[in-house]
Amino acid sequence: MKIGVFVPIGNNGWLISTHAPQYMPTFELNKAIVQKAEHYHFDFALSMIKLRGFGGKTEFWDHNLESFTLMAGLAAVTSKIQIYATAATLTLPPAIVARMASTIDSISGGRFGVNLVTGWQKPEYDQMGMWPGDDYFASRYDYLTEYVQVLRDLWGTGRSDFKGDYFTMNDCRVSPRPSQPMKVICAGQSDAGMAFSAQHADYNFCFGKGVNTPTAFAPTAARMMQAAEKTGRDVGSYVLFMVIADETDEAARAKWEHYKAGADEEALAWLTEQSQKDTRSGSDTNVRQMADPTSAVNINMGTLVGSYASVARMLDEVASVPGTDGVLLTFDDFLAGIDAFGERIQPLMRCRDHIAPVTREVA
């Protein structure tokens, strides 16, 4: 099972809590995180894109770096780890994304891929006059289908004459082309999102579910496998989890309860409000899971809370779920968390026993 890190491109990472570590996103922080991840043989690093935050006492995600420029910088200071940036497709023409991706492919020596998102938070785009109207919720995967067709044309042949409802290419050119086939990943959990991933993506991200229920996402992975069977393609699932680990189960649980007790209710109310704007995509979208009150303090990603041994055991359970190709990890404290993962958790994982033990780098 592959291991990735979901780098904190926005302030405070993924904990919407006054009790969680409070920090701003910087290149130096993300550089340290990804270089540590590479040192411990993580397979990939991904950054999201967020153009407007949730506010509240913690100003959650009100402060964000930009994904492609961040990952270009990280590509230049790493040598092995795969690097993925996220394209907010409403804001960037596909021909520009194709050229940016080809550039970072050159910087990274063929280690780059692109995560495509349709956009779900209207204020992110409305603030720039770029929201196409609420009918977009129902047509966004039609838009994305044309978008990825243009990308594949340009990456594959260097030229596109695509004509569609959303994009018109007139002998559009991109050169140099990527040195390797460009990986495309998506994060669809709705039926439309999974159908898109089955047709066009190499991997599909999904949320883990619950606290210490590592296989609860299995029905989602099964749906992705079923969708891929219809297209005759192999599209594995990468599952999002937060790791909160310590020497003992009790110590880790105490940290988790402390974070929950400091939940930023104002920021969470904003998330809930935005999740209700899309009435077209069904009840199984990513944003609706994010806003579920069960564990909204970390946007309801699957949460693994326990001793290093307990977390290792639960990650092995994740790996046992059919259709699972990897996990995308966040941490309550990224720098300490990655060190603990590399030194204390990964060596105990059966699914990572091919990785030689690594000790902490000397600064």
From Swiss-Prot:
Q: Recorded GO terms, molecular function? A: alkanesulfonate monooxygenase activity; uracil oxygenase activity
Q: Which UniProt keywords apply?
A: Flavoprotein, FMN, Monooxygenase, NADP, Oxidoreductase
Could you tell me the superkingdom of the organism this chain comes from?
Bacteria
Q: At which positions is FMN bound?
A: I49, K50, N115, E124, R140, Y141, S190
Q: What is its EC number?
A: 1.14.99.46
What biological processes does GO assign it?
A: alkanesulfonate catabolic process; nitrogen utilization; uracil catabolic process
Q: Which SUPFAM superfamilies match?
A: Bacterial luciferase-like (SSF51679)
Top-level EC class: oxidoreductase
Homology family: Belongs to the NtaA/SnaA/DszA monooxygenase family. RutA subfamily.
Protein name as it appears in the record: Pyrimidine monooxygenase RutA
> Gene encoding this polypeptide?
rutA
